[in-house]
A protein has these predicted regions:
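Gram-positive cell-envelope targeting signals
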Residues: 4-8, 141
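HTH-adjacent hinge/linker in prokaryotic transcriptional regulators
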Residues: 3-5, 13-24, 28-35, 39-111
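Glycine-rich phosphate-binding loops that contact phosphosugars or nucleotide phosphates
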Residues: 117-237, 243-250
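Short amphipathic alpha-helical surface patches that mediate protein-protein
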Residues: 27, 72, 117, 259-263
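A short, charged, Gly/Pro-tolerant segment at domain boundaries
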Residues: 249-270
């Protein structure tokens, strides 16, 4: 397939006024298109949804998902990795940590820990790569004496959400904030009265809109390279901030518990 950005520019003389608005928006906001709906694009470009559909047809594209895939492929061609592999990875990881740190709001962080500290029980929701962050969070907080349950599958998340109350908290990990199963479970938990803390890159996402506290990550979910772990690194940075703030507030208890855990683990070594 031809580079979609080149195709958009090559057809410029044939565009109507509405086409040019859509084309300009796509070229300017290509990094965000993969997380937008047809209605989002139309609204931001200042045209009707029908105008967006007609524009896509001119490109030979029938569905929005095909545009998103084309953009993801073309972006990869546009920004190939350069230099030694280890240096490229180091730069990517360094950038994502630095940028996530710049987005961290201390007041929101403290508010999130307040909710967790005074809750009856805490659940961590996440699927796929975000599930790794949720599972890591469970392990971290249990070691500090805070009962946390990580649920990594959508059906089980719904079951857990149905039994929550206003005394409970759900921490939801989702880079896009629009993962269907997780968002549905979070919405049900909110309906039951539970407080929602979201860890997401998109503060205007479906998940963020129903959250009591939003802790923003920097990494974007990629369609083509969804296996990259820079998104996970960003989530783990936020998780570690939560853990350290909780530990600071409960140091006496967590120190004693860590000593007991250390003894228990050492006793299992051969």
């Amino acid at each position: 397939m031809n580079n979609i950005f080149h195709t958009i520019q090559a057809l410029w003389p044939e565009y109507t006024k509405s086409d040019k608005k859509v084309a300009t928006f796509i070229l300017d906001q290509q990094q965000n298109i993969t997380n937008m709906t047809l209605a989002d694009i139309a609204g931001e470009a200042g045209v009707s949804e029908g105008s967006v559909v007609r524009f896509l047809n001119k490109l030979g594209i029938k569905k929005l998902i095909d545009l998103k895939l084309s953009i993801a492929k073309s972006a990869e061609e546009k920004h190939p990795a350069e230099g030694a592999l280890s240096a490229v990875v180091e730069e990517e990881f360094s950038d994502v940590v630095h940028n996530t740190a710049s987005l961290m709001d201390p007041e929101r962080l403290c508010r999130a820990v307040d909710l967790m500290e005074h809750s009856r029980q805490v659940y961590f929701f996440g699927v796929a790569v975000s599930g790794i962050a949720a599972s890591t969070g469970e392990n971290s907080f249990i070691r500090m004496g805070k009962p946390v349950h990580a649920i990594l599958e959508g059906h089980m998340q719904m079951i857990a959400a149905a039994g929550l109350t206003e005394e409970d908290v759900v921490v939801v990990f989702s880079l896009t904030g629009n993962t269907r199963d997780t968002c549905e479970a979070a919405a049900l938990a909110r309906q039951q009265g539970a407080r929602i803390i979201s860890v997401t890159s998109y503060v205007n996402s479906q998940l963020a809109r129903i959250s009591d506290v939003v802790l923003q990550t920097f990494a974007k979910e990629e369609i083509i390279n969804g296996g990259r772990i820079t998104g996970l690194v960003s989530q783990l940075y936020v998780l570690d901030c939560l853990k350290r703030e909780y530990n600071k507030r409960n140091r006496a208890r967590t120190v004693r518990l860590k000593e007991e855990i250390g003894k228990a683990i050492l006793s299992k070594k051969v």
